UniProtKB/Swiss-Prot annotation:
Gene: TXNDC11
Disulfide feature: C469-C472, C719-C722
Gene Ontology CC terms, in alphabetical order: endoplasmic reticulum membrane
Residue ranges of the region described as Disordered: 1-38, 935-985
Primary role: May act as a redox regulator involved in DUOX proteins folding. The interaction with DUOX1 and DUOX2 suggest that it belongs to a multiprotein complex constituting the thyroid H(2)O(2) generating system. It is however not sufficient to assist DUOX1 and DUOX2 in H(2)O(2) generation.
Residue stretches making up the Thioredoxin domain: 92-214, 649-799
Biased composition (Gly residues): 1-11
Matching InterPro entries: Thioredoxin-like_sf (IPR036249), Thioredoxin_dom-contain_11 (IPR052792), Thioredoxin_domain (IPR013766)
Family: Belongs to the protein disulfide isomerase family.
Keywords, in A-Z order: Coiled coil, Disulfide bond, Endoplasmic reticulum, Membrane, Phosphoprotein, Redox-active center, Repeat, Transmembrane, Transmembrane helix
Name of the protein: Thioredoxin domain-containing protein 11
Residue intervals passing through the bilayer: 65-85
Membrane topology summary: Single-pass membrane protein
Length: 985
């Protein structure tokens, strides 16, 4: 049965047996597996067949599994095929470009990027503007109308070509690799490209194109010469005589250098270079500022020799660089080669600028940051039209800059100032340095009946010299029509400001006691129409007694408090200086205004002046404090990054020379009367339903100084911990009565506050108790900000007796005592401050003496260096002359050596000819000798023949009849001589 069953199994049983044997069921199987690898292969194949057979049997028993497996496999194949087909990128070809400009536009539009055609048409035009654009670029689309407007005005002189440099099949895209669009290139014949990087405005583009078309200005007269030299841009003048030639030597080079100046200025980086020149005993740092074409070097041409002598130009082809404060220069042709690149480089490296034009591009930039780090900056926003023939406001700013930097009263600068003021001046003989001319008298100041008597108490340090002063606030028209200026009666606050400034000017009145009247004139603010005068005199005891009896002049003063707080009535006398109303003790005296000329050298807060076009960058002016809606976009601001403050000129005042001078003067003084400008967000409303009051810069005093306890939270949007306190302050506001307590907050990132109210960390909580605002308290930093802690803090520092109901009925005795204590403390504090200031003044005086000694030593060193320089120059001239002599001697010796070499060559040729002739002579001599020997031999033979006639003669060479036979060795000798001759050759 076992055998049948085995056979009955057929192949299946045999395969099972093989599998079992091969699988190592017994010792024999394992030996076979270890000995032969083919058995292992057969075993794995058997297992595969067995698995397939099991799957087939299962599918036959359960056909639904087979169908599911087949469906699953098909789904996997379809998914794999779909995934592989989507792996490749699907690229849609770009649409063909269309015309960017209209067909009626004067601009030639190469919208397919035909750069080769643009180069072809450029060769036939004198001036060409290439406008590279991208059709999708918003800046290119915005500049399209500006380009068309400029082309409509210049199409008869300039070829405008627009090129699509974005289409991937165009040559422009393949050859040009721009990082931004649009890009403007200008070509002047074969010179270029000159890239334009100015504002994309039609007037600016047209002005730039016209400057490329005409890079040189013709100077025909003295008036235009003064216009050229008084311009704020540096000027380079070239003198050329056209009488002898239509194109004098060097003119084309000078013309090309003017084009190079435009190109180099546009290619230069924003980092300025500093050059220091020394003239006399002072120096001025000259900084190169180049941006676009504004502020670049202007080039002019003079053809009149008499006009050229005014600027020290004598020879045709000379080049002159004008500088206002340093010595003007003439191009050193003996040092530098007269090329366009050298002239341009020399002018850019040695130029001197009064102020700089700024053009922020609107993106991230360090332009303003780099300029503000140099020191205080005066920003002037003015509406600028580049195409205008004249710019009166810029002329006034130029006049201010010239006076501000004219530290030594240079006569050339004074003449230029007279020309800017349109003052008739004598005809110029030369622009050489002369004695400084007298400055024009300042405008007179008309005093108005607004004077007050100032009583200096005995505790003041200089009361021993002047203890009675008369303060007068004066009004002046400042050059305007008297009818247009009103003279209002001054207020108490104006007099208080004058008093504050008066005490800051204490050193002005520190003199020996005298009965004479000593007066001084000061500016109270940056308004050119407001001055105050202080006239002081020492009053004796008799005079003092007389004054005491006169209408109570020196009555006990009153102490003024803030109008927003409750005042305590003080009846006791005080030692605080006070102001009397309309008390005239002294007659009117003449007053003189402060001198503005050379102020930059007399202050430690020298200003750098910058100009911005308000038509383009008024947003920056608004951020500095200018009104957003105004008819005339003129604005001035001083920014001092070191002091973290900035000041603005009153927008109600006109931007002109007098206002700018007063503005700069008030900033330059040691104790500036200018008030720091605070920038805040929009005015916040105080609706009744809001529990927390939002405070701004404008509403800070109104909220904090109100007759309530105020808890103020300082926060900022970028402070991550600040929002977590909102619910705490909302609960606090709900728990406290709103009629006696105010919870407020202020965003310090958008609102500036006075320095005494600024904080150094966020969040910060300040508490201002009612009626004691000067005793504000800061919440402890080491205590968590929670509702219970805030309530304890408020209850601890608030005064229950200071409620509004008790304030009106509170006794005045305690208030008077506290105020007396405060006043005594204030007086002692002021005395200490005065002593500190005097010590500082003495130290400054000592430092001044040291600086003067250092300056004197520096002057001596400079004088010594100049002498050494002159000695070196003399040595250099001697060496130069000696070098020229050596050069001439070298050339002479060279010529002699060349002549000697020629003669040696002739001798060599003659020697060669002599050698040849000598050879032939040797041959001839040898031949003659052989002939002689032959004759001797013939004679001997004849004698022998006579002796032996019967002997036969030997055979010889045939001879001519009548000739003697040649010797036997003649031919051999000739051959040897010829061989020698050949070897000699």
């Amino acid at each position: 049965m076992s055998e049948c069953g085995g056979r009955g199994g057929g192949s299946s049983s045999s395969e099972d047996a093989e599998d079992e044997g091969g699988g190592g069921g017994g010792p024999a199987g394992s030996d076979c597996l270890s000995s032969s690898p083919t058995l292992a292969t057969a075993s794995s194949a058997g297992r595969l067949r067995r698995g397939l057979r099991g799957a087939f049997l299962m599918a036959r028993q359960r056909p639904e599994l087979l169908c599911g497996a087949v469906a699953l496999g098909c789904a996997l194949l379809l998914a794999l095929k779909f995934t592989c087909s989507r792996a490749k990128d699907v690229i849609i070809p770009a649409k063909p470009p269309v015309s960017f400009f209209s067909l009626r536009s004067p601009v030639l539009d190469l919208f397919q990027g035909q750069l080769d055609y643009a180069e072809y048409v450029r060769r036939d035009s004198e001036v060409v503007l290439l406008f590279f654009y991208a059709p999708w670029c918003g800046q290119s689309i915005a500049a399209r109308a500006e380009i068309e407007q400029a082309a409509s005005r210049l199409s008869d002189q300039v070829l405008f070509v627009a090129i699509n440099c974005w289409w991937n099949q165009g040559k422009c895209r393949k050859q040009k690799h721009f990082f931004y669009f649009p890009v403007i290139y200008l070509y002047h014949r074969s010179f270029g490209p000159i890239e334009y990087k100015g504002p994309m405005s039609a007037v600016y583009i047209e002005k730039f194109v016209r400057r490329v078309m005409k890079p040189l200005l013709y100077i025909p007269s003295q008036s235009e010469l003064l216009d050229f030299l008084s311009n704020y841009e540096p000027g380079v003048l070239g003198y050329f005589e056209f009488s002898g030639s239509p194109q004098p030597p060097g003119y084309l080079t000078f013309f090309t250098s003017a084009l190079h100046s435009l190109k180099k200025a546009l290619e230069s980086t924003s980092s300025p270079r500093a050059l220091v020149s020394f003239t006399g005993e002072w120096h001025l740092e000259t900084k190169i500022y180049v941006l676009d074409y504004l502020g670049t070097v202007r080039f002019g041409v003079i053809t009149n020799k008499h006009l050229a002598k005014l600027v020290s130009l004598v020879h045709s082809g000379s080049v002159y660089l004008h500088r206002h404060f340093n010595t003007s220069l003439v191009f050193p042709r003996e040092v530098l080669n007269y090329t366009a690149e050298n002239i341009c480089k020399w002018a850019l490296e040695n130029q001197e600028t009064l102020f700089r034009w700024l053009r922020p591009h609107g993106g991230k930039s360090l332009l303003l940051n780099n300029e503000l780090k140099k020191g205080p900056a005066l920003f002037l926003f003015i509406p600028f039209n580049p195409l205008a023939e004249s710019h009166p406001l810029i002329d006034e700013i130029t006049e201010v800059a010239l006076e501000y930097n004219n530290c030594h009263g240079d006569q050339v600068v004074e003449r230029l100032l007279q020309h800017l003021r349109r003052v008739d001046a004598p005809v110029l003989e030369s622009l050489a340095l002369e004695v400084p001319a007298q400055l024009p008298d300042p405008p007179t100041i008309t005093a108005s009946p607004c004077c007050n008597t100032v009583v200096l108490p005995q505790w003041h340090s200089f009361s021993r010299t002047h203890n009675v002063c008369e303060l007068c606030v004066n009004q002046t028209s400042g050059g305007m029509k008297p009818s247009s200026v009103s003279v209002p009666q001054c207020s108490f606050f104006e007099m208080a400001a004058a008093l504050d400034s008066f005490y800051l000017k204490e050193q002005t009145f520190y003199h020996v006691a005298s009965d004479s009247i000593e007066c001084s004139n000061f500016l109270t603010s940056y308004s050119p129409f407001s001055y105050y005068t202080a006239c002081c005199r020492t009053i004796s005891r008799g005079v003092s007694g007389f004054i005491d009896s006169e209408q109570g002049v020196f009555e006990a003063p009153t102490v003024a408090f803030s109008s927003l707080e409750k005042k305590c009535e003080v009846d006791a006398p005080s030692s605080v200086p006070h102001i009397e109303e309309n008390r005239y003790l002294f007659p009117e005296v003449d007053m003189t205004s402060t001198n503005f000329t050379g102020l930059s050298c007399r202050t430690n807060k020298t200003l750098n002046i910058y100009l911005l076009d308000s038509n383009l960058f008024w947003l920056y002016a608004e951020r500095l404090g200018a009104p957003s809606s105004t008819q005339v976009k003129e604005f001035a601001a001083i920014v001092d990054v070191k002091e973290e403050s900035h000041y603005i000129l009153d927008p109600k005042q006109a931007l002109m020379k007098l206002t700018l001078e007063s503005f700069i003067q008030n900033f330059s003084v040691l104790y500036s009367p200018l008030k720091r400008h605070l920038i805040g967000s929009g005015s916040a409303q105080f609706p009744s339903q809001h529990l927390i009051t939002e405070v701004t810069t404008d509403t800070f005093w109104e909220v904090v100084l109100q007759k309530q306890d105020v808890l103020l939270l300082y926060y900022a949007p970028w402070c991550g911990f600040c929002p977590s306190l909102n619910h705490i302050f909302i609960q606090l506001a709900r728990n406290l009565p709103m009629d006696t307590f105010t919870v407020a907050r202020i965003d310090v990132s958008q609102n500036d506050l006075p320095w005494e109210f600024m904080v150094d960390r966020l969040p910060t909580v300040l508490f201002f108790p009612c009626n004691r605002k000067d005793l504000s308290v800061k919440y402890p930093e080491d205590v968590p900000i929670t509702l219970p802690n805030l309530l304890r803090f408020i209850l601890h520092h608030s005064d229950p007796a200071s409620s509004p109901q008790n304030v009106a009925n509170s006794p005045t005795k305690e208030c008077l005592q506290s105020e007396a204590v405060l006043q005594r403390g204030h007086i002692s504090h002021l005395e200490r401050e005065i002593q500190k200031l005097r010590a500082e003044i003495s130290s400054l005086q000592r430092a001044q003496v040291q600086v003067e000694s250092q300056l004197s030593s520096a002057r001596r060193d400079e004088h010594r260096l100049r002498q050494q320089q002159r000695a070196l120059e003399e040595q250099h001239s001697l060496l130069h002359a000696h070098s020229e002599q050596l050069q001439a001697l070298y050339e002479q010796k060279t010529r002699e050596l060349q002549e000697l070499a020629r003669k040696l060559q002739e001798l060599a040729d003659a020697s060669e000819n002599l050698l040849t002739e000598n050879t032939w002579l040797k041959i001839l001599v040898a031949t003659m000798e052989r002939k002689l020997e032959g004759r001797d031999g013939a004679e001997s033979l004849a004698a022998q023949r006579e002796v032996h006639p019967k002997q036969p003669e030997p055979s010889a060479t045939p001879q001519l009849p009548g000739s003697s036979p040649p010797p036997a060795n003649v031919s051999a000798t000739l051959v040897s001589e010829r061989n020698k001759e050949n070897r000699t050759d």
